[in-house]
């Protein structure tokens, strides 16, 4: 798993702070990597044992550039903790507007920050959210930012968040809402701007029935539009019978995974790796061609074909094949 993850040039790990941040989007529920306990005297205690083991394991395989921690704004706004007084799990159901929410997260993040600093991980840690409302993001940002945390979001474009998010991954096509000035300002501050696809995108995508070239097209789309990369929201969220049926609830077949149990890859996953490697080669060639206007113009012409996401699978194959010939010759 980690070897394949590394071959896809993954540089960030996703950690889970509270139980089940994504609700019904996954077949298997996610336990927290930080164990939160409310002591009998009303104070909070946190056990980072699992979190530490996970981050250290990822780092062994080179997945150590960024740690995205989910989520201050989970899908059901329900936070589970162990209650010593009742000797049972209890839940806080709340909203981002309440004092209860602010108290819960201020306590959690203060302790978490101290632990991250001790481990040397604070600067590369983001508090991450997934497709949350602008108002909730701003409320959460106030709390996290006051303690010096950086924040990440995979979701819709919001102008109010452009200068705030360290890692802003927008839905495919919403990247067109960024102005060139916004993208330049984010890049100057070392902020990351990427795109993602999900069940809302018919094509291009990496469903079971998508043409393989679509997976290669997506990272090249990011390269053509001056973005830092491409994210698919899930790659091993298996359903009940992942080897025989890739459908899951409302999601398109294969949307929740492209890598299979038993260390089995897929054509679409391998074509995605191909696209990621081509993205990296494009970045290298852009630097090399600064003093070679002829080759620079050729590369830019080929990339122009990837600037629009309004394509079908057959178009993706044609565009990918054309740029592959050029990249393989360089």
What residues fall within each predicted segment?
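Short, hydrophobic/amphipathic alpha-helical patches that form generic packing surfaces
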Residues: 1-4, 19, 53, 57, ...
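Aromatic-lined carbohydrate-binding surfaces of glycoside hydrolases
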Residues: 1-147, 154-163, 236-241
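Intrinsically disordered, low-complexity boundary segments flanking structured domains
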Residues: 53-54, 114-115, 179-184, 256-259
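Residue-level recognition of short, well-ordered coil/turn positions
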Residues: 63, 191, 290-294
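Catalytic domains of carbohydrate-active enzymes that cleave complex glycans
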Residues: 79-81, 89, 93-157, 227, ...
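Eukaryote-skewed repeat-based solenoidal scaffolds used as protein-protein interaction platforms
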Residues: 117, 135-154, 159-170, 174-193, ...
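Catalytic-core region of carbohydrate-active enzymes that cleave or remodel glycosidic bonds
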Residues: 167-251
């Amino acid at each position: 798993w980690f070897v394949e993850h590394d071959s896809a040039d993954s540089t960030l790990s996703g950690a889970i702070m509270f139980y089940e941040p994504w609700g019904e989007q996954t077949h298997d529920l996610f336990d927290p990597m930080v164990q939160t306990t409310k002591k009998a005297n009303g104070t909070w205690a946190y056990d980072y044992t699992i979190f530490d083991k996970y981050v250290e394991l990822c780092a062994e395989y080179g997945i150590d550039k960024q740690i995205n921690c989910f989520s201050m704004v989970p899908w059901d706004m329900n936070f589970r903790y162990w209650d010593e007084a009742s000797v049972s799990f209890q839940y806080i159901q709340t909203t981002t507007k309440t004092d209860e929410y602010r108290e819960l997260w201020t306590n959690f993040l203060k302790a978490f920050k101290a632990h991250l600093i001790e481990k040397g991980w604070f600067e590369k840690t983001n508090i991450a959210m997934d497709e949350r409302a602008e108002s909730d993001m701003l409320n959460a940002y106030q709390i996290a930012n006051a303690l010096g945390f950086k924040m990440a979001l995979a979701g819709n474009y919001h102008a109010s968040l452009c200068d705030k998010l360290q890692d802003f991954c927008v839905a495919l096509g919403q990247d067109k809402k960024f102005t060139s000035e916004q993208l330049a300002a984010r890049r100057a501050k070392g902020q990351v701007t990427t795109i993602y696809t999900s069940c809302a995108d018919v094509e291009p995508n990496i469903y079971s029935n998508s043409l393989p070239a679509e997976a290669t097209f997506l990272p090249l789309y990011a390269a053509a539009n001056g973005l830092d990369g491409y994210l698919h929201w899930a790659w091993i969220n298996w359903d009940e019978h992942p080897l025989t049926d890739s459908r899951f609830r409302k999601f398109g077949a294969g949307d929740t995974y492209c890598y299979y149990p038993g260390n089995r890859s897929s054509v679409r996953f391998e074509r995605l790796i191909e696209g990621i490697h081509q993205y990296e080669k494009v970045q290298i060639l852009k630097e090399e061609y600064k003093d070679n206007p002829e080759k620079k113009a050729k590369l830019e012409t080929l990339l122009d074909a990837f600037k629009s996401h309004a394509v079908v699978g057959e178009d993706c194959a044609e565009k990918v094949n054309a740029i592959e010939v050029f990249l393989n010759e360089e």
